[in-house]
């Protein structure tokens, strides 16, 4: 009898790769294969709660006071399996919440706390997140008690808030509304590095690639020891801090407040060499049950814990709010030292041992700082702010409270998504505030407006183009953009190159809106798109009514941070066959990125491209991809003609030309975005559905459904109602 493990799939040599999902994958053969699958992630098939679950309703029924009371009790309920430093879990819960939210970046709105992604790879195993798994596990009894009444995403942030409150800090408020996902966000680009803490993301003189907002793979922001090329240099570190925090929408004052406020509490952990630390969460053995980084150094916990390898405690009261961070920062001169793990840090010169250790029997130690802490003293701009906070602790507390709220709510979207009794009343400019609706047009008003729009002399393509330009700025990542607010008429959107072709149409619609006085311009723009589609369908011999839900409002310039909105400008919009410039990234990849931000599925992407090409809303007015003899009519001709084997395609510079195989006559021109629907096997399969003889009716109905979805992506007020 043999005990050798056998492969159940072959009966021959054991091989784990023979198992389900193993073996050579498509991506191994074709590493540049288009990731159409990313449009279908987070489907109902992965959601255990089902499509009928209403998180808003579930959270609103929670006993919020009881939940917070349970969290307060947890803060000092130290567990033997992972004891609390200084007898209080608050500092590690602040780190947990910060690192959940701190992955957000403005470039594409991805990352952040809004989806509970810290539970999944790669975030759950990042080097910067060592031992945060313990914090989430400490929370499990509370999450188990309240179940789906509060999401993990909300609980992580609320726990950080309660941690601050139990340590004597007054927070700015808290809003729930983050719904959990059940698998990793595989669409997020975290970098190309293949080893943790590598940094191949820079070019030239330290130009960080967009949309990244961290200096190394596996870090939230910056290396606390300083840049990899300048360890121990606070000024070099300050440059990294300024860039990474700016890419998370933080200015200098917010940056100083966040770093100092966070480092008022707790400590870092570097009691011994990293060689004692085991595998991360994803690589840990089965019996570890989702806990990583098991340590063989001493007890592996408490005073023996190892996380970053740095061993720094900033203040005399690490479990209580104070101004000691700034007092210590400026009181002492600082000299470099190595932590017990060998990491570079700083210790106060000639200081007394006034800093407590993490356990009651720990000896006191001298004040210590990170290189990035010293940046707040030695960078001239940061120093000015730091000294003001040193002299005015109340200003520091106010700045930290607001910056913490912004950090933890930046990707939650507009206030209409906020839930709970602690939502601040104040409107903040970064929330992209909207005025309250004062009038909702009646059905008669809408009918009158539709008639005026139809009689305006504007073509179907012009009407559809302006509505698309307004609505397609939406990003499902951070819930910004969209048609509500009609910000297409304000800076910076009115000045974007991609929007110049719709300027005349917009001006005409503004005239109609002012003359009517019965609807917002935001509603009129979307309604114009509906009219355009109905006209295009009529031109194709079909009578339809595009669903329209009024209630949008018009934002003012004072409610619009032009600089903040600049990141929403599309560098490419394949739906309009637009690219601002030539990129190393193929156009079809940029198209999928845009589609994913619009929360479109692959079928929705496909049908929208076909319909918008038939109507012809190309930003430059070209005929690329307009594979029809009746442009402006809502036909499925794009698919029929793209799939026609009588056409032979040839590259011609940046475009492609389609020739009749028999006559050699040039019939069409198209871009990579157009031709990918015949080239990519998945997209071609979808195109065949809409290009079939029985696909015309399906094409129109699915196009209208996808169109209405895009127009309503930012109508969070409807869900709230």
UniProtKB/Swiss-Prot annotation:
Catalysed reaction, written as an equation: H2O2 + AH2 = A + 2 H2O; 2 H2O2 = O2 + 2 H2O
Record's GO cellular component terms: cytosol
Keywords: Heme, Hydrogen peroxide, Iron, Metal-binding, Oxidoreductase, Peroxidase, Signal
Covalent cross-link Tryptophyl-tyrosyl-methioninium (Trp-Tyr) (with M-248), where: 98-221
Key word DNA-binding present: no
EC number(s) recorded for this UniProt protein: 1.11.1.21
Active-site annotation: 99
Keyword Heme (UniProt): yes
A biological-process GO annotation: cellular response to hydrogen peroxide
PANTHER family tied to this protein: CATALASE-PEROXIDASE (PTHR30555:SF0), HYDROPEROXIDASE I, BIFUNCTIONAL CATALASE-PEROXIDASE (PTHR30555)
Family: Belongs to the peroxidase family. Peroxidase/catalase subfamily.
Protein name listed in UniProt: Catalase-peroxidase
Organism whose genome encodes this protein: Ralstonia pickettii (strain 12J)
GN (gene name): katG
């Amino acid at each position: 009898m043999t005990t050798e493990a056998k492969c159940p799939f072959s009966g021959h040599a054991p091989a784990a790769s023979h198992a389900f999902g193993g073996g050579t994958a498509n991506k191994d053969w074709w590493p540049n294969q288009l990731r159409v699958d990313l449009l279908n992630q987070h489907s109902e098939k992965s959601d255990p709660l089902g499509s009928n679950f209403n998180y808003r309703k579930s959270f609103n029924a929670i006993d919020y006071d009881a939940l917070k009371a349970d969290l307060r009790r947890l803060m000092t309920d130290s567990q033997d399996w992972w004891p609390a430093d200084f007898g209080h879990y608050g500092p590690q819960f602040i780190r947990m919440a910060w690192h959940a939210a701190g992955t957000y970046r403005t470039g594409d709105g991805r990352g952040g706390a809004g989806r509970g992604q810290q539970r999944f790879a790669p975030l759950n195993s990042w080097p910067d997140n060592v031992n945060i798994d313990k914090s989430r596990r400490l929370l499990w009894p509370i999450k188990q008690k309240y179940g789906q009444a509060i999401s993990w995403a909300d609980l992580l942030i609320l726990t950080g808030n309660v941690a601050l409150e139990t340590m004597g800090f007054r927070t700015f408020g808290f809003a729930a509304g983050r719904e959990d996902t059940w698998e990793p966000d595989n669409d997020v680009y975290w970098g190309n590095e293949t080893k943790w803490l590598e940094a191949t993301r820079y070019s030239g003189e330290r130009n960080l690639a967009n949309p990244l907002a961290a200096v190394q793979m596996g870090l939230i922001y910056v290396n606390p020891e300083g840049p990899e090329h300048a360890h121990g240099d606070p000024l070099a570190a300050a440059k990294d801090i300024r860039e990474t925090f700016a890419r998370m929408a933080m200015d200098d004052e917010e940056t100083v407040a966040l770093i100092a406020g966070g480092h008022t509490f707790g400590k870092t952990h570097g009691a011994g060499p990293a060689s004692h630390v085991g595998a991360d969460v994803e690589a840990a053995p089965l019996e570890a049950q989702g806990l990583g980084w098991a340590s063989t150094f001493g007890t592996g916990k408490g005073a023996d814990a190892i996380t970053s390898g740095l061993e720094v405690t900033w203040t005399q009261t690490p479990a209580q709010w104070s101004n000691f961070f700034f007092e210590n920062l400026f009181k002492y001169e600082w000299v470099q030292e190595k932590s017990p793990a060998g990491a570079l840090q700083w210790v106060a010169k000639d200081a007394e041992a006034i800093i407590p250790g993490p356990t009651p029997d720990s000896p006191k130690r001298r004040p210590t700082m990170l290189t990035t802490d010293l940046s707040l003293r030695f960078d001239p701009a940061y120093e000015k702010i730091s000294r003001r906070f040193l002299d005015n602790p109340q200003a520091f507390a106010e700045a930290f409270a607001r910056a913490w709220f912004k950090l933890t709510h930046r990707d939650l979207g507009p206030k209409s998504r906020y839930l709970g009794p602690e939502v601040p009343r104040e409107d903040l400019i970064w929330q992209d505030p909207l005025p309250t609706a004062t009038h909702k047009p009646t059905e008669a008003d809408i009918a009158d407006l539709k008639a005026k729009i139809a009689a305006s002399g504007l073509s179907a393509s012009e009407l559809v183009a302006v509505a698309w330009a307004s609505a397609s700025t939406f990003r499902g990542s951070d819930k910004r953009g969209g048609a509500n607010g009609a910000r297409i008429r304000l800076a910076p959107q009115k000045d974007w190159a991609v929007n110049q072709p719709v300027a005349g149409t917009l001006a005409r619609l503004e005239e109609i809106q002012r003359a009517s006085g019965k609807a917002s311009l935001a509603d009129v723009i979307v309604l114009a798109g509906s009219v355009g589609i109905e006209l295009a369908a009529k031109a194709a011999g079909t009578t339809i009514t595009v669903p329209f839900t009024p209630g949008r409002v018009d934002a003012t310039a004072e409610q619009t941070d032009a600089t903040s909105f600049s990141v929403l400008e599309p560098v490419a919009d394949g739906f309009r066959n637009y690219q601002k410039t030539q990129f190393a990234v193929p156009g079809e990849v940029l198209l999928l990125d845009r589609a994913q931000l619009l929360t479109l599925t692959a079928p929705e992407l496909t049908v929208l491209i076909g319909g918008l090409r038939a109507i012809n809303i190309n930003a430059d007015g070209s005929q690329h991809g307009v594979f029809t003899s009746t442009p402006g009519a809502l036909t499925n001709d794009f698919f029929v003609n793209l799939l026609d084997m009588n056409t032979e395609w040839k590259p011609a510079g940046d475009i492609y030309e389609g020739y009749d195989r028999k006559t050699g006559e040039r019939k069409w021109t198209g871009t990579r975005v157009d031709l990918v629907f015949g080239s990519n096997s998945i997209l071609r399969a979808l195109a065949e559905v809409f290009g079939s003889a029985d696909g015309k009716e399906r094409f129109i109905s699915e196009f209208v459904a996808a169109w209405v979805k895009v127009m309503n992506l930012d109508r969070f007020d409807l869900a709230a109602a």
